[in-house]
């Protein structure tokens, strides 16, 4: 009964647990618990190798403990049982059972099998977490873990494990992994330690990587599996499997043994289940296997499948996905509104609905369609009274069959019928709006109304729904309202319907336009829709277009009785006149090289200021012959009379002169870019009172009334009167009767234009003379001018006289905007748009279209002109509307415009020049285009004087008067001396005669400076050039060469680099210059290199003999009797192969034996056994690995044995107890010394005492006792072996007696060494125990082998480090070669003295080496001697001759008596003597000589060190001074750059503030805003901070020089600061809302602070004087140091300056950023100012409310607080105003600092440039042959 209750409780627990777990899955992802996948799957677990599976097998373990059993038996034929079969080691033993004695069972493989696999097969897909393997044996040397996801069809490797990954798994990375799925080899779990219970751990996911998506395909591939396989590939052994000298089999100790294998995981449910059940068909032993992990998920979240990998049926409204935090949108139920029970998922619908629904219902009922059966089928629609779930909710459609489509199809939702295209209505029973004619036969149902919607009234239906007739808008007509009335357009082209044409009244021919596009019909050359724009190349003429310049008018006779008739002046050079007809600009004249066809110039005398031009006496003569006189460029010119000029003169026309003195005078006015032009044409005509002008008008465009306008400029304040008379020349015009009466109007002094009140009628086609006489009105001022400046005459059409032109409204606008008054003014004022439009229309009307631009093809940039006015774009100095004339004082109209005359005022009579040639009018004796030079033969412009050249030259320099092109071989400023190569006296008339040195000067063979006459003989003699000699300088001096027979030959200095005697005439070839007698051991055609056998710098006379070691030098380069041939530059000797060093005196790495017959020999070190290829350079011994030896490491080393080609093993012999080489090279048996025994020769042999390693023999009797005891022991052992068995043995008295006797004998024997014998007994007992428990075939593993290997590795690393240390020790400080040249010369003589000693030492070394080799051979032979070979050794010793040995050692045979033996002997107490040549005396002499040499070299080294220290001290001092100078320069440059930027920014800020504050229109509110912006800048507030700032400034200024030039600038800046202070005071006076008392006080304090700054600056200037003196003292020292520095100093300095410039640019950029920050702060301050204003306004309102109302106490308190805040704010503003003054001070100081820094930088730049020039000059000199 109790058992039944327990079983029931267990069932309830099992049922309740899943329910609780499933509740956790609601709304969240859930996962089954992890477990051991091995549990319950013993049948699915297999191993490829198991020990004792078919028969019992023996195996052993490794152990070193005594009395420990080492070998056991494995019998796995039956399962494991604690009592009956504990030796079973099947694979199921590794499944964890948590039993107390779980270490008593394990799985074990067969012995010596390397490749073994363990495989776990799962029944479904599982999720894998990690694997843990716990080994009983060593862990495998290499293994790998694989997984399968397809039940074993394919496998993938999880991870590799190996002790040596590179050898076990080549090509596999050893990590670390770069990504979570990287395949790497892990070496952490494959070592020899621990020997048992070692673990191998594999995690499916590396925890070092972050996992963002656990359902990523890569992650899923790592954690899911159906099969797991562990492959062991190689056993871990201790190396004894390779040994062959033992008898036992080592394989029995090596196998795989596992205590347990844990595979942690869970059933894979994709996050949709927390419980799993057994898979169908699997064992149902859930209750018998607790902890088993099953493979089928109990799915939640509406999922299904073994792994919950899909949705349940009818749950497809949301897609399946792995479990997440919120799983409400996974596998949702489909919504088919009860019309279907089947659905499927469509991704397209899911995406289209934005992830809301993806389920599509299948097989909808009740006339339903749609993804959710939510729609009615065709010809049905949803009944609005029923729900969607109602099976009767879809009802049939009710549509008009004539107006609907598809037999009455309707909308399935609202029942709306589907109408034809032009039908509407719920039942499709009427036409749409805009359509008419409902018809069954019409496919569209109704016809479209064809009305133009722009021309139709948009009210309701645009046409009748039955007839289709349209209803038109205004100005539209037609059956479809698609046409505009005449005078309108735009229907269909604009959005406004029919709009007026609005054609231009002047530009269009009529008011009507095209009804399509509104284009008006234009007059010629007019374009645009309204015809109001001129075509390209045309323009609209303004009102004042018809202008007649006064300069082109003819003079009228003087009418005043007080003024005489003006003198008759003939026409000057023609000025272009306006043409008589359009086009108004004439074509450009072709340029001509001469301005006149024929002229004769008569040069007059210089004219006074107001000259009266008089004709010459020959006037009558020229006039009779057809010539006339004219003034051109200030000269009276006779020109050929032309017919037109004659006709004009007959007509009484004359021109106006340029010269003063006449009633009329032309005044040209030059135009400037910065001057407004208030005149037209070239200038004015200055008209005297009573004089007049005649204007010829011949280009009237149309018969109209015109206003006469006169433009002028008065010279006084008096008004003038103009009398106008118009004379018609031509036929009369009835429309314009000729009125020749005089008309008068006033020219007021205050104006610039005057208009005749009444217009005059002028007809086109006629020519008119408009005569105007100017009279000055009476004036009270007697000194007022009687002249007036007349500019031009203008004709302005009267708008009212233009027939049928414009309406009264246009005329009213014309008058309202004063269009005529504005058009009359000169200067190109911009007219109002209304005036410009009306005038343009009138111009097009009058001229029948637009007027052609006619821009001059040379003077204008193009053919286009301005649309209104027609002004062309002129080139420089070109004027006129058409750009056809040169401006005054210019000439030569050409492609680049006109050129300025630039007449020299001191050489010309006027500023005018010929407009064609540009020739100015020159004074006497002056010529040139600009009258700027003297005539040839004269100089000294403008006071030209005749050249003084002693009649030997015709011209001279026009400025200095130096004569040019002197004749007759004369020279000099005044041709006062002879040329070089000539002798004479040109001043006294003595001609220049040639000198022959040896030929004439200029012949190429003149080799003298000059020649002179002998004062006695008068014969000329030569003064030879350097290098020439002889009476005629026709040969070269000694040390010079040259072939003087060739043209251009010269004697040049022989370039032999100072290596010849310059006094030796044969030192170089006199013709070729080749050096023949080189000195100082040099050779070559220029003595430029050292002789063979010498090296050094031949240019510095420093060629030294080569000192090559002949042993290591190439024999072909070392001839007998002469030094070896080394490199002539470096002294490097030509070494034999394998030899190195400058003198070829040492072997190269990899070579040895310098004393060999052929130099150094290769080491030939064994590549496999040597540590490197380098050997000892004397002995040739290679550096071997620890286990190898021999000279080239081709033998096993000491204490090692074996085949060196395969492996050398450690003998482990005790070196103190062995003889060389410690053990047998083939068997490894230790070779013990006599008296030593043991397998390792580490103990004394029997019969010897125990004092190891001495092991002295015992007494002779000891051998007898030892033999007796040994025999007895053998008998006792024999007796024991004869016993049947130990159990049946019974002690007998006889045997017991014998045993006792044996013990007594042993005690007797041990009386001498009892302790030692006891140890031997213990050792014997241990040996017996080991013999009993150890297999006879076992190999004893010595653990010291591993320790020795580690020691060898440490030794190898130490040798490498030692080698690196030696190489670095060889590197010494590099000393400048030039610095030690002098010291090296001293070494040279010491070296010569030591060379002989060195050779003696080398000879002694050879003898020593031979002696050492002899000793080594003897030692080696002695070591090889064995006890059994002593007779051989004795024979060899007897064969030795003492006399011979004595002779080799001491120098003489030792057979003589000691008194007679001069060299002594072995028995004489001495060896060697003065003349003895034995090895010992030679060695002693060599040692003494070596000691002396070492002392001398040590002394020399000391001297070298002292010299090197002095050089270093000098270099350090130089570097220190240089660094100090550079630091000062850097500091100056940085400071200058910083303040230069601050100065620029500060100046810009001050200018902006000054400009703003000086504006009188600035309001006080704006000033306050500006003050707030400035006050927002945080500056030092307290006087102490300001003082600290000034002290910092003084410290900076103390390191800067040259203040004097800046003090004046500082005073100016102080004045500016004072002005700024006054301006600030004005600002404060204007700021009424701010209390200014504190600000005024702050300003006064600022003034005092200014004075203090001045005092501080004076003190700084005094300090500067002291610094300047120190700098002056330092400059010579710096200069000397710079001279001794390398030539790269200049380049370094320039690079540093360039770096400073770059830093300056960086500081400038930072300054700009600071300025931007300041601007941002300023804007912020402005915003703050606005907030302050708003606060003040609110405050005023609050005050007003408080006075008008009775408020509560709380409101009053609030008002009080606000008042206090406002007062505090006002005080804050006052404080900020004080900070403004501080800012001004800082700005001034910054400006001063910037200027000072700039000057310092300029001085440093100049110093650098000078230094660079100096260095370049030095380099150029050094590059020459001689300095």
UniProtKB/Swiss-Prot annotation:
Positions glycosylated per UniProt? 231, 1001, 1329, 1485, 1496, 1513, 1533, 1599, 1629, 1644, 1672, 1686, 1702, 1726, 1745, 1750, 1761
| Disulfide bond sites | 267-276, 269-297, 299-308, 311-331, 334-343, 336-361, 364-373, 376-394, 397-410, 399-417, 419-428, 431-446, 449-463, 451-470, 472-481, 484-498, 501-513, 503-520, 522-531, 853-865, 855-872, 874-883, 886-898, 901-913, 903-920, 922-931, 934-944, 947-956, 949-963, 966-975, 978-992, 995-1011, 997-1022, 1024-1033, 1036-1051, 1054-1068, 1056-1075, 1078-1087, 1090-1103, 1106-1126, 1108-1133, 1135-1144, 1147-1160, 1163-1175, 1165-1182, 1184-1193, 1196-1208, 1211-1223, 1213-1230, 1232-1241, 1244-1255
Query: For the region Domain I, what residue ranges are annotated?
Result: 1477-1827
Annotated region described as Domain II, given as residue ranges? 1258-1449
Does this entry carry the keyword Disulfide bond?
A: yes
Domain writeup: The alpha-helical domains I and II are thought to interact with other laminin chains to form a coiled coil structure. Domains VI and IV are globular.
What does the UniProt function comment say about this protein?
Answer: Binding to cells via a high affinity receptor, laminin is thought to mediate the attachment, migration and organization of cells into tissues during embryonic development by interacting with other extracellular matrix components. Positively regulates apical-basal distribution of Muller glia cells in the retina.
> What's the protein name?
Laminin subunit beta-4
Q: Which gene encodes it?
A: lamb4
């Amino acid at each position: 009964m109790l058992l039944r209750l327990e079983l029931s409780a267990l069932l309830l627990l099992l049922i309740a647990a899943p329910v609780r777990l499933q509740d956790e899955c609601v709304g969240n992802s859930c996962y089954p618990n992890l477990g051991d996948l091995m549990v319950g799957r013993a049948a699915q677990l297999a191993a490829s190798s198991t020990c004792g599976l078919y028969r019992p097998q023996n195996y052993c373990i490794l152990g070193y403990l005594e009395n420990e059993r080492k070998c056991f038996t494995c019998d796995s034929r039956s399962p494991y049982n604690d009592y009956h079969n504990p030796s079973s080691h099947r694979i199921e033993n590794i499944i964890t059972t948590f039993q107390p004695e779980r270490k008593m069972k394990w799985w074990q493989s067969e012995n010596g099998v390397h490749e073994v696999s363990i495989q776990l097969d799962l029944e479904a897909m599982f999720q894998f977490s990690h694997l843990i393997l716990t080994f009983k044996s060593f862990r495998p040397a290499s293994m790998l873990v694989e997984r399968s996801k397809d039940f074993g069809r394919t496998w993938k490797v999880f991870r590799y494990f190996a002790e040596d990954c590179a050898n076990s798994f080549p090509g596999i990375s050893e990590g670390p992994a770069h990504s979570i799925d990287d395949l790497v080899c892990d070496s952490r779990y494959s070592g020899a330690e621990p020997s048992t219970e070692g673990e191998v751990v594999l995690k499916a996911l590396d925890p070092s990587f972050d996992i963002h998506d656990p359902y990523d395909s890569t992650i899923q591939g790592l954690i899911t599996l159906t099969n797991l396989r562990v492959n062991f590939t190689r056993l871990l052994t201790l190396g004894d499997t390779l040994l062959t000298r033992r008898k036992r089999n080592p394989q029995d100790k090596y196998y795989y043994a596992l205590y347990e294998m844990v595979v942690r995981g869970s059933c894979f449910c994709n996050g949709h289940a927390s419980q799993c059940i057994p898979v169908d068909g699997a064992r149902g032993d859930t209750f018998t296997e607790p902890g088993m992990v099953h493979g089928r998920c109990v799915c939640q979240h509406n999922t299904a499948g073994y792994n919950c990998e899909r949705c349940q049926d009818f749950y497809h409204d949301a897609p399946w996905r792995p479990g997440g935090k919120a799983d409400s949108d996974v596998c949702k139920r489909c919504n088919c509104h009860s019309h279907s029970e089947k659905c499927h998922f469509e991704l397209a619908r899911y995406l289209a609905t934005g992830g809301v629904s993806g389920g599509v219902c299948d097989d909808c009922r009740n006339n339903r369609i749609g993804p959710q059966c939510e729609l009615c089928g065709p010809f049905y629609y949803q009944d609005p009274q029923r729900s969607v779930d109602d099976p009767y909710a879809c009802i049939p459609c009710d549509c008009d069959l004539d107006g609907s489509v598809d037999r009455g199809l309707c909308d399935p939702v609202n029942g709306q019928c589907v109408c034809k295209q032009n039908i509407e209505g719920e039942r499709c029973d009427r036409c749409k709006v805009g359509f008419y004619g409902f018809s069954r036969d019409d496919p569209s149902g109704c016809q479209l109304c064809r009305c133009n919607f722009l021309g139709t009234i948009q009210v309701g239906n645009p046409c009748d729904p039955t007839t289709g007739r349209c209803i038109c808008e205004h100005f539209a007509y037609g059956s479809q309202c698609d046409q505009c009335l005449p005078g309108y357009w735009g229907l269909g082209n604009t959005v406004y319907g029919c709009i007026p044409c609005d054609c231009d009244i002047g530009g269009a021919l009529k008011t009507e336009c095209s009804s399509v596009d509104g284009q008006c019909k234009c007059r010629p050359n007019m374009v645009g829709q309204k015809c109001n724009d001129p075509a390209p190349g045309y323009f609209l003429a303004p009102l004042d277009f018809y202008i007649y310049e006064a300069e082109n008018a003819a003079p009228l006779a003087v009418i005043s009785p007080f003024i005489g008739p003006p003198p008759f002046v003939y026409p000057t050079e023609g000025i272009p006149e306006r043409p008589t007809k359009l086009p108004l600009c004439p074509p450009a004249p072709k340029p001509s090289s001469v301005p006149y066809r024929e002229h004769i110039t008569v040069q007059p005398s210089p004219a006074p200021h107001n000259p009266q031009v008089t004709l010459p006496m020959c006037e009558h003569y020229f006039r009779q012959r057809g010539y006339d006189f004219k003034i051109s460029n200030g000269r009276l010119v006779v020109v050929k009379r032309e017919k037109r000029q004659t006709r004009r003169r007959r007509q009484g026309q004359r021109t106006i002169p340029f010269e003063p003195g006449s009633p009329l005078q032309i005044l040209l006015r030059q135009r400037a870019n910065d001057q407004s032009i208030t005149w037209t044409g070239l200038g004015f005509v200055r008209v005297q009172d009573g004089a007049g002008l005649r204007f010829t008008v011949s280009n009237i465009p149309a018969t109209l009334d015109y206003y006469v306008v006169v433009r002028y400029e008065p010279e006084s304040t008096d008004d003038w009167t103009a009398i106008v008379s118009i004379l018609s020349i031509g036929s009369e015009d009835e429309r314009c009767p000729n009125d020749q009466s005089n008309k008068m109007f006033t020219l007021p002094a205050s104006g610039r234009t005057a208009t005749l009140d009444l217009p005059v009628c002028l007809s086109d086609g006629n020519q008119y003379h408009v005569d105007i006489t100017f009279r000055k009105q009476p004036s009270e001022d007697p000194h007022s001018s009687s002249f007036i400046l007349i500019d031009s005459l203008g004709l302005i059409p009267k708008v009212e006289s233009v027939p049928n032109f414009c309406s009264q409204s246009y005329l009213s606008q014309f008058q309202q905007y004063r269009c005529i008054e504005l058009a009359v003014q000169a200067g190109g004022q911009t007219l109002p748009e209304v005036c410009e439009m009306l005038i343009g229309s009138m111009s097009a009307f009058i001229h029948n279209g637009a007027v052609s631009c006619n821009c001059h093809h040379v003077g204008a940039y193009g053919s286009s002109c301005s649309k209104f006015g027609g002004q062309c774009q002129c080139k420089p100095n070109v004027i006129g509307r058409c750009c056809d004339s040169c401006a005054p004082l210019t000439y030569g109209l050409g492609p680049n415009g006109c050129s300025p005359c630039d007449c020299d005022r001191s050489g010309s009579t006027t500023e005018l020049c010929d407009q064609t040639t540009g020739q100015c009018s020159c004074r006497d004796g002056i010529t040139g285009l600009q009258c700027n030079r003297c005539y040839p033969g004269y100089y000294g412009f403008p006071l030209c004087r005749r050249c003084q050249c002693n009649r030997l030259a015709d011209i001279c320099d026009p400025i200095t008067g130096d004569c040019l092109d002197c004749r007759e071989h004369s020279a000099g400023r005044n041709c006062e001396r002879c040329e070089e190569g000539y002798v004479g006296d040109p001043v006294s008339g003595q001609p220049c005669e040639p000198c022959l040195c040896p030929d004439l000067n200029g012949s190429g063979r003149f080799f003298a400076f000059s020649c002179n006459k002998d004062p006695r003989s008068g014969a000329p003699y030569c003064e030879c050039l350097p290098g020439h000699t002889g009476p005629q300088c026709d040969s070269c001096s000694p040390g010079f060469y040259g072939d003087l027979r060739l043209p251009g030959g010269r004697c040049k200095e022989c370039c032999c680099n100072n290596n010849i005697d310059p006094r030796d005439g044969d030192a170089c070839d006199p013709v070729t210059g080749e050096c023949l007698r080189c000195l100082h051991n040099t050779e070559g055609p220029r003595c430029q290199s050292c002789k063979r056998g010498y090296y050094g710098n031949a240019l510095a006379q420093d060629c030294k003999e080569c000192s090559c070691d002949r042993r290591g030098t190439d024999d072909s380069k070392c001839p007998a009797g002469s030094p070896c041939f080394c490199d002539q530059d470096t002294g490097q000797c030509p070494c034999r192969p394998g030899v190195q060093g400058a003198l070829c005196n040492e072997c190269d790495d990899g070579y040895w034996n310098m004393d060999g017959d052929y130099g150094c020999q290769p080491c030939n070190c064994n590549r496999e056994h040597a540590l490197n290829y380098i050997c000892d350079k004397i002995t040739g011994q290679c550096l071997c690995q620890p286990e190898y030896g021999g000279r080239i490491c081709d033998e096993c080393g000491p204490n090692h044995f074996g085949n060196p080609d395969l492996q050398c093993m450690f003998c482990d012999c005790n070196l103190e107890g062995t003889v060389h080489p410690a053990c047998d090279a083939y068997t490894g048996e230790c070779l013990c010394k006599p008296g030593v025994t043991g397998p390792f020769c580490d103990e004394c042999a029997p019969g010897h005492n125990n004092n190891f390693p001495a092991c002295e023999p015992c007494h002779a009797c000891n051998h007898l006792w030892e033999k007796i005891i040994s025999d007895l022991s053998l008998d006792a052992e024999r007796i024991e072996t004869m016993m049947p068995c130990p159990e049946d043995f019974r002690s007998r008295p006889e045997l017991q007696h014998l045993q006792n006797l044996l013990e007594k004998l042993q005690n007797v024997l041990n009386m001498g060494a009892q302790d030692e014998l006891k140890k031997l007994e213990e050792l014997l007992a241990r040996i017996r125990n080991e013999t009993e428990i150890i297999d006879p075939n076992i190999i004893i593993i010595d653990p010291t082998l591993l320790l020795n290997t580690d020691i060898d590795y440490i030794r190898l690393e130490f040798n490498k480090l030692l080698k690196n240390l030696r190489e670095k020790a060889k590197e010494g400080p590099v000393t400048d070669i030039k610095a030690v040249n002098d010291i090296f010369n001293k070494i040279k003589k010491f070296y010569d003295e030591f060379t002989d000693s060195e050779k003696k030492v080398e000879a002694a070394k050879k003898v020593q080496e031979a002696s050492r080799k002899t000793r080594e051979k003897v030692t080696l032979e002695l070591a090889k001697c064995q006890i059994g070979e002593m007779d051989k050794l004795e024979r060899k010793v007897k064969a030795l001759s003492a006399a011979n040995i004595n002779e080799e050692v001491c120098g003489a045979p030792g057979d003589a008596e000691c008194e007679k033996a001069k060299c002594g002997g072995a028995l004489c107490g001495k060896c060697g003597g003065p003349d003895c040549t034995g090895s010992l005396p030679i060695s002693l002499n060599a040692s003494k000589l070596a000691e002396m040499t070492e002392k001398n070299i040590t002394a020399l080294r000391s001297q070298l060190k002292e010299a090197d220290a002095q050089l270093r001290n000098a270099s350090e001092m130089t570097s220190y001074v240089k660094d100090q100078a550079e630091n000062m320069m850097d500091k100056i440059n940085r400071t200058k750059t910083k303040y230069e930027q601050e100065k620029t920014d500060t100046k810009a800020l001050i200018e902006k503030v000054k400009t703003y504050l000086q504006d009188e229109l600035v309001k006080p509110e704006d000033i306050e805003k500006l003050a707030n912006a400035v006050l927002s800048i945080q500056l030092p507030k307290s006087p102490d901070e300001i003082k600290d700032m000034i002290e910092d400034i003084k410290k900076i200024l103390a390191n800067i020089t040259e203040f004097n030039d800046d003090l004046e600038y500082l005073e100016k800046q102080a004045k500016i600061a004072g002005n700024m202070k006054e301006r600030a005071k004005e600002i404060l006076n204007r700021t009424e809302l701010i209390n200014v008392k504190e600000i005024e006080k702050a300003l006064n304090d600022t003034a005092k602070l200014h004075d203090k700054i001045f005092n501080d600056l004076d003190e700084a200037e005094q300090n500067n004087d002291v610094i300047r003196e120190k700098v002056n003292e330092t400059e010579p020292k710096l200069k000397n140091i710079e001279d001794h520095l390398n030539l790269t100093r200049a380049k370094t300095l320039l690079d540093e300056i360039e770096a400073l410039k770059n830093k300056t640019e960086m500081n400038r950029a930072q300054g700009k950023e600071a300025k931007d920050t300041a601007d941002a702060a300023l804007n912020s301050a402005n915003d703050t100012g606005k907030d302050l204003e708003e606060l003040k306004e609110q405050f005023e309102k609050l005050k007003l409310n408080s006075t008008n109302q009775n408020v509560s106490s709380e409101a009053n308190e609030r008002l009080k607080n606000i008042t206090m805040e406002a007062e505090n704010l006002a005080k804050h503003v006052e404080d900020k105003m004080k900070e403004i003054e501080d800012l001004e001070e800082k700005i001034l100081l910054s400006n001063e600092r910037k200027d000072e820094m700039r000057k310092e930088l300029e001085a440093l730049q100049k110093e650098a440039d000078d230094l660079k020039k100096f260095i370049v000059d030095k380099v150029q000199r050094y590059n020459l042959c001689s300095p």
